[in-house]
Amino acid sequence: LPRMPSCLLKLTRVVLSHKLRALFILAFKVMSLASIMLYWRITEDPKGRGQVYSLPVEIHCAHSVPSPHTTAVGPSPSPGDVYFVETSERTNPGYLFMCSVESAARTHPGTRVVVLMKGLANGNASLPHHWGFSLLSCFPNVEVRPLDLLELFSGTPLAKWYLQAQQRWEPYFLPILSDACRIAIMWKFGGIYLDTDFIVLKNLKNLTNVLGTQSKYVLNGAFLSFKPKHKFIELCMKDFVENYNSWIWGHQGPQLLTRVFKKWCSIRSLRSSTSCKGVSALPREAFYPIRWQDWKKYFEAVSSSELHHLFNNTYAVHVWNKKTQGTRLEITSQALLAQLHSHFCPATYDIMKKNS
């Protein structure tokens, strides 16, 4: 009987420690779920939900556009095409999306620019009634097509992954799906891939087997240019499947490309080499002149000398839509983003002014 109090005390301590551990685990799970929900809220386009444009859907092609007789034609993709991909169900492209495609079409007048949209893959013969599609019809080198994921991934290591991924919930599925699409497109067709938050300043056709450097530690696949069936892209597809992790942001995208490039070049640091075995990683200024941490610079005024420097040293500007979306842009201001729209997607820029 005298030992009862000490036993009870030990039992109480054990129970309390288990409760504290359980509370800690519960708090961790709640925080994880909250961060995932916050991510999805951030990545939604606030302007894409029910936005109504005042302009009529029929757009007059007022600006000079590429000549149709110099444009690649044919029913299927061909080597050298420029690709954009929309992996969500959205079929109401916003201003930045439209500027991306328009700037690519203008800088590549003799090249087919293919816009693949998952939301169109439902058997409809006609495009949705939207000003963006009317504007794209002004460019004879632009083709809007449904994104058939089963067909795209067929015959690649990504086919089995895609079927399995559809049967489970993943926090970053859409970005990962986009990562998969770009390497599948590069493997099957080759050509140029661009994210829909790029503004293209120059023709990219002289770049082959090239990707861009985001920072001194990481490469980025928002721009890719490769010949079809390239061994580097094949290794990317294998790494995608063998080292798959859907819970780490960027693991299947920038980090994947960085891993594969280091193995490809047999290096431990990106500073050791920027080109080897026929594959090149261009310096940050070529495609990512403004770091994602400095995204607010797009909304700040720039001098003519700064703009001239950018035009001379950069192929295309990545706007980091995940950060910039929802931020109000004074379209007639001297802000960098407004000037980029004015110079490289004037038709989209005019519509932005009329709707501002």
Language-model-detected regions and their locations in the chain:
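Short aromatic/hydrophobic "clamp" motif used to bind/position activated sugar donors
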Residues: 191-193
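Glycosyltransferase-associated regions of secretory-pathway enzymes
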Residues: 2-178, 196-356
